[in-house]
UniProtKB/Swiss-Prot annotation:
It comes from Influenza A virus (strain A/Kiev/59/1979 H1N1). The active site is at D151, Y402. The chain crosses the membrane at residues 7-27. Its EC number is 3.2.1.18. N-glycosylated. The lineage of its organism: Viruses, Riboviria, Orthornavirae, Negarnaviricota, Polyploviricotina. This is Neuraminidase. Glycans are attached at N44, N58, N63, N68, N88, N146, N235, N285, N365, N455. It comes from the Viruses. HAMAP family: INFV_NRAM. It is found in: Virion membrane; Host apical cell membrane.
């Protein structure tokens, strides 16, 4: 074979190999395309597009080694359509209270980045429930937690996180600078109310969907303050109560009607010989019921009920099962303030059912320890101390604190009634536990059910002191 023939032969072989390789590559591409079509042909692409991918990252140093923890969750999409929460349903009939959430924030905070907080409360939209809380601008087990027993400081802020989660910098949303606060959802957006400033000139800042819409200046220059629990929204209007004046004498109390963050009406209560602070409010059949704290002279709780025009009625829970702390032993009640052990108090709540009332209270008469729910079938109007049901949720030996009401609207639950719920603050640290340099709390919550429940204790459970305290 001469050289020219060799060149032609080698070229032909190379061309043949190239053609075969090209055919194989084309076949491979066709095979992949067909396989992909078979796998995806019957799937609902809309469902995939409606998913939300949420990635949480936490970076820290462990024994001089850098650790990055990444947790990716694929969450099925929710219908986020806005709607006006009607608020015109009656309270659901219930037989007791089922545990709903527990955040264990103090226990987790011994080794994790958890905010120092107090005054937690819960509020729900038609899509979710969130825990709101007042931070101290500090983390547990850190030097800035020192002295956080103080109620009012420029470092405090209203923040929120998903219910049941320990409040941390990684899951919390800033809401407002505040040392007293409230928040609620009208079905279209969050209304937040944050009070901050000096005792003799504090200002309440109203925000709607995060934008400042209104301010309210202290009118008595004596520590303007609000609910420390959720406000109430009915048919697009939201309602809150504020107090200004002495904590141990006659003060001034105003109800505000707010629409999309703007005040449309306000009135001052004509309530001589009554004291209203830190009201726990809920909607019921289109009206608003608030059960409050008398820090002046009542060991039973005052109430105010009003409609959307702010026409109101006032009174005190008549039952001889007293709801405040401190308080006397149960006995003869009154529809006026019960003056025995009536000074001071603690934020609390009750739910009215006709002439009956569910009363939430500490188990101790004199300190913020333990918690129980009591059903008095005639307690709203009668003064005896007879009751039918008592459900324990925190043992007498464990610390409790503030408590308050919140509701779940039918738009959230799918029920045809308003589900009553409550939360309990579990305070730890100072002033009672003097081995610590800080004051903070965790929280638990319960919702009313018309089925079986249980007596038990769900305490905070943290072992003190922490490293920073030693």
């Amino acid at each position: 074979m001469n050289p020219n023939q060799k060149i032609i032969t080698i070229g032909s072989i190379c061309m043949a190999i190239g053609i075969i390789s090209l055919i194989l590559q084309i076949g491979n591409i066709i095979s992949i395309w067909v396989s992909h079509s078979i796998q995806t042909g019957s799937q609902n692409h809309t469902g995939i597009c409606n998913q939300r991918i949420i990635t949480y990252e936490n970076s820290t140093w462990v024994n001089q080694t850098y650790v990055n923890i990444s947790n990716t969750n694929v969450v099925a999409g929710k219908d986020t359509t806005s709607m006006t929460l009607a608020g015109n349903s009656s309270l659901c009939p219930i037989r007791g209270w089922a545990i709903y959430s527990k955040d264990n924030s103090i226990r987790i905070g011994s080794k994790g980045d958890v905010f120092v907080i107090r005054e937690p409360f819960i509020s729900c939209s038609h899509l979710e429930c969130r825990t709101f809380f007042l931070t101290q601008g500090a983390l547990l087990n850190d030097k800035h937690s020192n002295g956080t027993v103080k109620d009012r400081s420029p470092y405090r802020a209203l923040m929120s996180c998903p219910i049941g989660e320990a409040p941390s910098p990684y899951n919390s949303r800033f809401e407002s600078v505040a040392w007293s606060a409230s928040a609620c959802h009208d079905g279209m957006g969050w209304l937040t109310i944050g009070i901050s400033g000096p005792d003799d000139g504090a200002v309440a800042v109203l925000k709607y969907n995060g934008i400042i819409t209104e301010t309210i200046k202290s009118w008595r220059k004596q520590i303007l303050r609000t609910q420390e629990s959720e406000c109430v929204c009915v048919n697009g209007s939201c309602f809150t109560i504020m107090t200004d004046g002495p904590s141990d004498g006659q003060a001034s109390y105003r109800i505000f009607k707010i629409e999309k963050g703007k005040i449309t009406k306000s009135i001052e209560l004509d309530a001589p010989n009554s004291h209203y602070e830190e009201c726990s409010c809920y909607p019921d059949n289109g009206t608003v019921m608030c059960v409050c704290r008398d820090n002046w002279h009542g060991s039973n709780r005052p109430w105010v009920s009003f409609n959307q025009n702010l026409d109101y009625q006032i009174g005190y829970i008549c039952s001889g099962v007293f709801g405040d702390n401190p308080r006397p032993k149960d006995g003869k009640g009154s529809c006026d303030p019960v003056n025995v052990d009536g000074a001071d108090g603690v934020k609390g709540f009750s739910y009215r059912y006709g002439n009956g009332v569910w009363i939430g209270r500490t188990k101790s008469n004199s300190s913020r320890k333990g918690f129980e729910m009591i059903w008095d079938p005639n307690g709203w109007t009668d003064t005896d101390s007879n009751f039918l049901v008592k459900q324990d949720v925190v043992a007498m030996t464990d610390w409790s604190g503030y408590s308050g009401s919140f509701v779940q609207h039918p738009e959230l639950t799918g029920l045809d009634c308003m589900r009553p719920c409550f939360w309990v603050e579990l305070i730890r640290g100072r002033p009672r536990e003097k081995t610590t340099i800080w004051t903070s709390g965790s929280s638990i919550s319960f919702c009313g059910v018309n089925s079986d429940t249980v007596n038990w204790s769900w305490p905070d459970g943290a072992e003190l002191p922490f490293t920073i305290d030693k």
